[in-house]
Amino acid sequence: MVDAGHEPSPWIPAPIRWGVLAVLTVLFVGIGFQQARLDAPAVDEGVDVSSGVAALVHRDLRMVPEHPALPKALAALPALLAGPVVPESEAWHEGEWFNWSDDFVAANEDAGSLDATFLWARLVVVAQGVAIAALLYALASRFFGPDGGLVAAAAWLTTPYFVGLGHFAMLDVPFTLAALALVLVTLRWLARPTLARTAAGGAVLGLALATRHTGLVLAVWVVLVVVVKLRSRPFEALQGLVVVGLVSVLCLWAVYRGLSPSGPPPEVTARFEGLVATQTSSVAVGLVGAMPRPLEWQAGVASMGQAGTNRPASLAGQSWSGGRWWYFPVAAVLKLPAGLLAAVLAGWVVARRHPARLRLAGVVLAPALSLWFVVLVQPLNLGLRVVLPSVALALVGLGALVAPVRARLAPGPVEPATGARRLARPAVLGVVGLVMASQVAAMVTAAPHSLAWSPPPFRPAYRWVSDSNVDVGQALYEVRDWVVRHDQPFVAVGSTRGLTVGGGSRELVGADPADVQ
């Protein structure tokens, strides 16, 4: 179904369209699996995977407060096939989740189960990356037809940065999936606001809240959509808000009590309540406190408030502490293919003339910009990955590029299809093929270091970008191999908690410059 209700039938034959998507999906999965198998655990993966495994094994969420539990538990579910060691160390009993992550990672490295555990967890995220492509296809198709859906999905599947992030068991990909799913469900509700679709929207919103706390931004957006859509029918608007709120909260509770039926034990409850008490001045914590919410989830909001302090960051040769408003736009230029960025901008310019442009702005751009703004005002420039949902939603605009080519070259109602007009179908196929060829070339040449890839001329990447724009600790195993071939080298490398370089290496940070020389 096309949202505008007037788009012509697709020009790219369905067998070609589905064949292209199948090939790109196989490449995405194949490259993702290769890197999931070879890369060392990322910095955030240690905490996320260990806490997810603990939640499933002990039915206890004491190790989950910093971020919601759902994506961790989903990734941990197949990871149990590796038979991970789940130590009940002092850190476990004290609820020190970072220290317990150290214990988990170290114990599984010693037992030889670490790599298998993380590989199984990462396969879940690879599958979620494919699901994101499917949602982008569905979203763009509703506005621009199947050809537009093909372009949007292909852009996601072939961009090196997305491929690089798409195999790490962190929260960025799952939350992007949740955000896109909520946008699609909301579009369907706008087309026909039935009670069943209202409840479905509430369910997806609840899952988004159980995936990342910034899902609260999406909750505000959903409220505004319902109010605007039903503004002439206030009783129905109130009914819709009640249904969305009730179902979303029930889903949130279902996730948390499904994982921890008895709730946190008394000592953990006291610790979580103390964490919340330290953030009483926080508006977000206060609003969440007024909700009927699981304590573990509220403690996560408070924990994020504690973590939201100025941190060192750098980009394009500049370094600072805190946040910069220009960080994410510049990071996008330094990490994403120039052709893709130009196409996205051109697509949204063309989309301004779309008959459904207001709905496109309200249902695609509004949540994308809202999520972007919330991250922008935080003093944490941790990498482009934290605005991944916004970047993914921006890809929907690529679908608009198919329409002007088709309109210019298609036969008019009277004029015969002569001259250039006879080239319409080959031209559309050629444009799409050229974009895809350049994207696939970047995708293939970036492997097996997709995350570290940057487009020319911003190479080598580490001279231009830092943090998760280039490195999340995935190269630790390669650094270890390098250390073995050198005599006590000085090393500075990020790695997940519980892992060290070893091999006789010396710490570069804090070393005497005379010794390094």
What do these predicted regions represent?
Residues 1-31, 130-134, 141-142, 151, ...:
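Start-transfer (signal-anchor) and selected internal transmembrane alpha helices
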Residues 152-157, 184, 205, 209, ...:
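Short helix- or helix-capping micro-motifs
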Residues 61-124, 265-322:
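Interfacial juxtamembrane loops and adjacent helix segments
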Residues 22-25, 220, 226-227, 241-250, ...:
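Signature aromatic-anchored transmembrane alpha helix within multi-pass, membrane-resident enzymes
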Residues 123-143, 181, 185, 349-353:
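Transmembrane-helix motifs of polytopic, lipid-linked glycan transferases
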Residues 8, 141, 182-198:
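Membrane-interface transmembrane helices that cradle and orient dolichyl/undecaprenyl
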Residues 152-153, 188-206, 368:
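Short hydrophobic alpha-helices at membrane interfaces in multi-pass membrane enzymes
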Residues 42-43, 161, 167-175:
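Short acidic/glycine- and proline-prone juxtamembrane loop motifs at membrane-interface regions
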